């Protein structure tokens, strides 16, 4: 920032600011927070007049799924990214602040010269700048440019490679490409000690857990975990229920069965027309307390980050769908096989939706689940960018499977839209029947307690037949 004259000019804006202290932060415990939404005397604020610019990066789901395919994985952070990007000098008068170093000095006027936190356009300006940097340097650093375009979320880099040598090379390419934009990568951390030098390791011990886009990652054991803060009350309101559910941050749906149960419970409260501040009825309150008590087990669950074996010869995706009167959902697994026959099957992601409050038939809901699965598998393929050998889609509804295999002109208009959506992303040959007891999507259609989920092999690794070469026909 730079000091400017205090004289008034047309079209300027002063951004209010205050300090916020966060004791849980490893660095920058005291941060300045700017409020560009504060209205002036004419009723407008800077944020009310700005466009947000849209999205210039891949969404979080794609980046997190892709992060799970790397044998050697590492993360980094763009140091002070916003402060590395200049604002047009003609527009800096819209980013003025009042400041003084201590209480004895007079208040001075400054203009912020760079992209500023708290403004509506800041995320787009920063991420679009990174995209432009990647485009400009694509000729010099094609590998680094590709990663900047696909594996960066805001200022967080999550990427990796299949071999240690490739990972080291990628790391150096990223350092060089960001240096071209005057930026520095720091807070390095990886799942291999040879990949990240001790001096770069941001003081993390081997056993430390690092927060990666809201999910905790233990690089030593290379696994994800969750930290859900639980407040157990004797009596609860609908507001308490929603507050607790909102704390379960699970972008990939790894806890999808637990989240589905929470969604179903919340819909039940809406059906009872309970106000936000009303206490829950005794039976409902007891049910909720049991759920919250079991929810603490979530913090003990560890999930492998990497979902593929080293040097896979065959990679298969297996998706499952199911529905009940309460909800419907889809689950996707990755099966990888080496040339010597070693197999690995891991849960990739899940999605669930509560059923409409209007009475709907089970076949109709099963169709919704199949469409949801088709979309989820399409997104997973888009994220992984792997050479998938085969894709298998499983449903325990013979009715839906018969609809999928029928010619379009033979279908009722009521089902046609969903089936056409499914056919855009899948082929009828990929769909197969699975017995209900072997269908892990049953858990996202009905929900499950955390205690049962922790040890549920069917959820984490899919049905046992995936570990063989013989599948149900």
Which sequence ranges carry the predicted segments?
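RNase H catalytic domain
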Residues: 151, 372-440
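A short, polar/acidic, helix/strand-boundary loop motif
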Residues: 55, 107-131, 336-368, 406
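Conserved beta-strand/loop block within the catalytic cores
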Residues: 1-55, 162, 187, 194-217, ...
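Catalytic palm subdomain of template-directed nucleic-acid polymerases
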Residues: 39-49, 84-86, 90, 146-181, ...
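C-terminal reverse transcriptase regions that engage the nucleic-acid substrate
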Residues: 44, 61-68, 111, 148, ...
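Active-site palm subdomain of RNA-directed nucleic acid polymerases
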Residues: 123-169, 173, 375-393
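Catalytic-core region of right-hand nucleic acid polymerases
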Residues: 2-128, 225-268
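Polymerase palm active-site segment centered on the conserved acidic dipeptide of motif C
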Residues: 4-7, 71, 75, 159-223, ...
């Amino acid at each position: 920032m730079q000091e400017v004259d205090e004289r008034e000019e047309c079209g300027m804006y002063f951004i209010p600011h205050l300090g916020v202290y966060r004791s849980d932060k490893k660095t920058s415990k005291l941060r300045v927070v700017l409020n560009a939404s504060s209205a002036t005397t004419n009723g407008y604020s800077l944020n009310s007049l700005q466009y947000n610019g849209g999205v210039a990066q891949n969404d979080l789901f794609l980046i997190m799924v892709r992060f799970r395919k790397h044998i050697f994985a590492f993360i980094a952070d763009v140091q002070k990214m916003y402060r590395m990007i200049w604002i047009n000098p003609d527009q800096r008068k819209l980013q003025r602040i009042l400041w003084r170093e201590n209480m004895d000095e007079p208040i001075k006027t400054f203009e912020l010269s760079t992209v500023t936190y708290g403004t509506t356009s800041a995320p787009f300006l920063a991420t679009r700048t990174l995209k432009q940097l990647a485009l400009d340097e694509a000729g010099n650093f094609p590998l680094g440019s590709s990663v900047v375009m696909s594996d960066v979320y805001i200022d967080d880099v999550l990427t990796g490679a299949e071999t240690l040598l490739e990972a080291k090379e990628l790391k150096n390419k990223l350092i060089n490409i960001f240096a071209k934009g005057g930026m520095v990568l720091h807070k390095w951390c990886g799942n291999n000690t040879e990949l990240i030098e001790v001096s770069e390791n941001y003081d993390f011990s081997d056993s430390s857990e690092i927060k990666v886009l809201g999910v905790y990652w233990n690089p030593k054991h290379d696994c994800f975990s969750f930290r859900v803060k639980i407040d157990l009350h004797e009596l609860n309101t609908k507001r308490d229920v929603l507050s607790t559910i909102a704390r379960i941050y699970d972008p990939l749906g790894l806890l999808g069965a637990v989240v589905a149960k929470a969604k179903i419970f919340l819909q039940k409260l809406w059906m009872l027309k309970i106000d936000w501040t009303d206490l829950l009825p005794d039976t409902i309150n007891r049910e909720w307390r049991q759920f919250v008590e079991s929810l603490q087990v979530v913090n003990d669950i560890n999930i492998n980050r990497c979902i593929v074996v080293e040097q896979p010869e065959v990679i298969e995706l297996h998706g499952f769908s199911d529905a009940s009167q309460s909800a419907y959902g889809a689950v996707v697994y990755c099966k990888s096989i080496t040339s010597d026959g070693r197999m690995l099957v891991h849960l990739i992601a899940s999605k669930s939706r509560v059923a409409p409050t209007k009475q709907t038939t089970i076949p109709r809901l099963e169709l919704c689940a199949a469409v949801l699965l088709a979309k989820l598998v399409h997104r997973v393929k888009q994220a992984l960018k792997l050479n998938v050998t085969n894709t298998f889609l499983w449903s325990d509804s013979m009715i839906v499977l018969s609809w999928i295999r029928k010619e379009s002109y033979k279908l009722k208009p009521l089902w046609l839209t969903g089936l056409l959506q499914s056919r855009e992303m899948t082929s009828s040959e990929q769909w197969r029947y699975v017995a209900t007891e072997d269908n892990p999507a049953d858990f996202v259609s009905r929900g499950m307690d955390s205690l049962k989920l922790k040890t549920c092999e069917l959820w984490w690794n899919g049905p046992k037949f995936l570990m063989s070469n013989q599948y149900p026909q």
